[in-house]
């Protein structure tokens, strides 16, 4: 679609029945498989996209997407990322130097850096893989069917073992065992009468 607004560098291989919309840019040693949909303001650099992949408004650099996976909108694959079959990378997700196994999903607002994720894992909204200690990068491992709840921090190097369950809001600094639920957050407190006391304090406050 719209070849006048699309840039595909010479030598790029594109499979049959693949749709490339306007404003897409494909550079370098890239290959696009069959039956793909590449749309939005997507940029693909030195990357391989297998068959039946959907890319919507994403930046993909020196990475590999396997069959039936999808990414976007507004997502980014930084170098050395490998996205497995049927993996979903949603809006505002960034992946760097990491692998995601078949069926794993990261739907919203996550950073996955220097990590190896297995199959059928759920990465919740706002999850951050904390990979840098100020001097060195460290890797984390998340095994098959683990669940990482929203706003969790995975502080590398740690391992979440098979079917490990990390509760929302937790900061993980130690390994999580298989089938284990980890909750690491302050206990919720109920302070009765606070609002009325605050109103009175505000009323008596003098500028």
Specify the residue positions occupied by each region the protein language model found.
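Extended, small-residue-rich solenoid/repeat segments and analogous flexible loops
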Residues: 1-70
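Glycine-rich hexapeptide-repeat left-handed beta-helix
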Residues: 55-207
């Amino acid at each position: 679609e719209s070849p006048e607004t699309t840039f595909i560098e010479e030598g790029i291989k594109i499979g049959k029945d693949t749709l490339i919309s306007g404003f897409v840019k494909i550079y370098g040693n890239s290959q696009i498989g069959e039956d793909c949909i590449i749309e939005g303001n997507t940029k693909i650099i030195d990357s391989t996209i297998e068959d039946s992949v959907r890319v919507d408004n994403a930046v993909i650099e020196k990475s590999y997407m396997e069959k039936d996976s999808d990414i976007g909108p507004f997502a980014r694959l930084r170098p050395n990322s490998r996205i497995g079959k049927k993996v979903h990378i949603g809006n505002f997700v960034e992946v760097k130097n990491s692998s995601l196994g078949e069926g794993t999903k990261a739907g919203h607002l996550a950073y996955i850096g220097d990590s190896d994720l297995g199959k059928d894992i759920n990465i919740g909204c706002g999850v951050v893989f904390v990979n840098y200690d100020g001097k060195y990068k460290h890797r984390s491992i998340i095994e098959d069917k683990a669940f990482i709840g929203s706003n969790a921090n995975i502080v590398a190097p740690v391992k979440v073992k098979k079917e490990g369950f990390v509760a929302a809001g937790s900061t993980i600094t130690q390994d999580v065992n298989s089938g284990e639920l980890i909750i690491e957050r302050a206990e919720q407190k109920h302070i009765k009468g606070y609002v009325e006391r605050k109103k009175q304090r505000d009323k008596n406050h003098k500028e």
